[in-house]
Structure formats: C-alpha cells, structure tokens
Regions:
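Extracellular ligand-binding interfaces
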Residues: 18-113, 117, 125-139
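Short carbohydrate-recognition loop motifs
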Residues: 1-26
Length: 140
C-alpha cells in the first residue's frame, strides 16, 4: 500500500488486515539471505493503527539452524509461539506508540541470532492492524 499511512521509506509498505486474535504475514526460503554479525541490531519499522490497536506486536526471524525459534515481542503476552523468556519469545518492552512510525530494535544476541544467516521473517499481531516497512539489521 502507498497511503494511509504513507510508507516510512520507498513507495510501498505492507499493511495487515484488521483481525481479532493472532494474525501474521511472513516469508521464508529466501534465496537472497543475510548474515547477522556479532553485535548487530535487528530493526523493523511499524505503524500501529490507532483506531484498531493490536495488544501485541511480534517479529520472528528464521535461520538455517534453528528455524523460527527467534522472536521478540512488545505489549501483552498473547501470542503463543515459543517459550517466554528465551530466544524463542523475548519480551522487549511495552507496545510502541500508535499513529506514528516507530523503529523496533532488538539486539541480535537477545534472540540467539549472532552469527546466523536469515532466510525468513514474520510480522505477527494479536488483534488490530499495523503497517510494516523497512526491516533488516543495523551495525553499531
């Protein structure tokens, strides 16, 4: 989509449907992979719909050695993937502010991704709607 909200970067962003409960969009099996180096930070830009606020936002990463067992979440603990307090479901903080673009940041080490190569990501919500834009990594 290209408006409501305007993308954070480029000309298009990906917006979820308005859904009750757990919902997500994702990709895996990417042939254009990237490696996470020690000390890097994983980032994703999200815009939470203030009229349809989710109670939880989760980002998931898929690597070649441990699959989808790398997750970080913000807000309530409603999404059942992984084990709380581990690399498979790490609480990062409260739900980000709604109605503006927010850069989500997760130290790769918090979700067990230092030195791993990614081939998939998932953008998961509980209730509500969000728009997602640039996702990748940042080097300190």
């Amino acid at each position: 989509m290209s408006s409501n909200p305007a993308p954070f970067s480029g000309t298009l962003a990906s917006q979820s449907n308005i859904v009750s409960g757990e919902h997500q969009h994702y990709f895996f099996g990417a042939t254009n992979t990237f490696t996470i180096n020690t000390g890097e930070t994983l980032v994703a830009y999200v815009y939470l719909d203030p009229a349809n606020l989710p109670s939880e936002v989760m980002v998931q990463w898929k690597d070649f050695s441990n699959g989808w067992e790398h997750r970080a979440y913000w807000g309530a603990n409603n999404i059942s993937f992984g084990v709380a307090g581990t690399n498979s479901r790490r609480f990062i903080g409260p739900l980000p502010p709604a109605g503006q673009w927010v850069r989500l940041e997760v130290a790769a080490s918090l979700v067990g991704l230092d030195g791993q190569t990614l081939n998939g990501m998932a953008f998961t919500l509980f209730d509500g709607r969000a728009t997602w834009d640039h996702a990748g990594k940042a080097t300190p």
